[in-house]
Design a protein with these regions (language model features):
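Single conserved hydrophobic/aromatic residue that forms the stacking wall/gate
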Residues: 1-6, 10-13
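Acidic/hydrophobic-patterned starts of short beta strands in beta-sheet-rich repeat architectures
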Residues: 20-30, 42, 76-88
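Beta-propeller fold detector
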Residues: 7-8, 52-59, 113-118
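Beta-propeller blade termini
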Residues: 12-20, 68-78
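Secretory pathway targeting signatures of secreted, lumenal, and periplasmic proteins
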Residues: 130-183
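Structural motif
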Residues: 2, 34-48, 91-107
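Surface-exposed amphipathic alpha-helical segments
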Residues: 133, 193-223
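Conserved blade-ending motifs and adjacent loop-strand segments that build the rim/top face
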Residues: 53-74
């Protein structure tokens, strides 16, 4: 076991929500000195009172331990159940952008992956990775020019789609260049997307690109 003691843990947030469709829970996340997020999932059982369903019976601490990248447990896929973020571990702790697996825990302590996203906290958006891509070699290439960031998702080295974060005076005209389509407009930023020629082969089109793109809301609200 990791022998964590309370004093080494900095409690980041607590979130209330459902762990199964009929079981409310409190998700309390602490971050340890190695930048791992440790989440206790507390439910109330008539016979036992408060129970931590994420508890590892052997180590006596939570088994819900994932790299911390400033993301909170949340219902990422809209199914009414809270998922825990599990960012890809190979990025540095300061790096807030990257792929995230979202794990849903059951009240009996079982868990499974229920979503995958590319989260771009630096620009305030995320993209839901289609289920059919989960077993493929998907990577992200990020490039930046003046007033424009581009994130390209590639499968087996093929560029499938790009998402652009565009600022500056001529952002509207740049959001419509070539085959780009406008995804969202904010006060000073336009988010645009583009699907490339190979996209249909991987089941991606402009409609799915639109539906898979979301702005991150209330990220900074540490409730």
């Amino acid at each position: 076991g990791s022998g964590l003691v309370g004093s080494e843990m900095c409690i980041r947030d607590s979130v209330t929500g459902m762990v199964d469709k009929d079981t409310p829970a409190v998700f309390i996340t602490g971050v340890d000195i190695t930048s791992m997020a440790v989440t206790d999932i507390l439910i109330y059982r008539q016979e036992a009172g408060l129970v931590n369903v994420a508890l590892d019976k052997n180590s006596g601490v939570s088994a819900a331990v994932y790299p911390y990248r400033q993301l909170s447990p949340q219902d990422i896929d809209g199914d009414g159940i809270i998922e825990l973020p599990c960012p890809e571990a190979d990025s540095a702790a300061e790096q807030t952008d990257g792929f995230v697996a979202w794990m849903s825990w059951k009240s009996d302590g079982r868990f499974e992956q229920s979503a995958k996203t590319y989260h771009c906290l630096s620009a305030g958006w995320y993209f839901t990775i289609p289920l059919s891509w989960w077993n493929w070699d998907v990577d992200a290439l990020v490039t930046a020019i003046s007033n424009e960031n581009q994130m390209t998702l590639r499968i087996n080295g093929d560029s499938v789609l790009s998402i652009y974060t565009i600022t500056g005076e001529n952002r509207d005209s740049r959001s419509r260049m070539g085959h780009r389509l406008v995804l969202r407009r904010q006060t000073t930023t336009v988010y645009a997307g583009e699907v490339f020629e190979i996209a249909p082969y991987y089941g991606m089109d402009e409609d799915l690109l639109r539906r898979s793109f979301n702005l991150i809301l209330g990220t900074w609200n540490n409730s």
